């Protein structure tokens, strides 16, 4: 069993997120909302497919793909991006490419 299976992960801190969203042209209201949310993330394996769930009080986002394969994802501000998720030890690497600039997010994952 992989180290992440059967666990959920809660975001504890986010650095530079407001500046990043501002650079993407996200408005002030959505930036304030995004900065106020600490989502819980879970990755569920079903056969060869993985579902990446991001759970927050305002909405739940689900994206499914084969592991380390590109998939379509809708961001909080409604943009469609191409994403790839991989693990490096206990870090989840979530890369997004869209009409603006690419984004890579590394998250340390101590389970809750």
From Swiss-Prot:
Q: InterPro entries, per this entry?
A: Calycin, Fatty_acid-bd, ILBP, Lipocln_cytosolic_FA-bd_dom
Q: Does the keyword Protein biosynthesis apply?
A: no
UniProt keywords, alphabetically: Lipid-binding, Transport
The record's PROSITE patterns line, in alphabetical order, gives: FABP (PS00214)
Transmembrane stretches, start-end: none
Q: Which superkingdom?
A: Eukaryota
> What Pfam families would the database entry show?
Lipocalin
- The name this protein carries in UniProt is Probable fatty acid-binding protein
Q: Please give the organism.
A: Anopheles gambiae
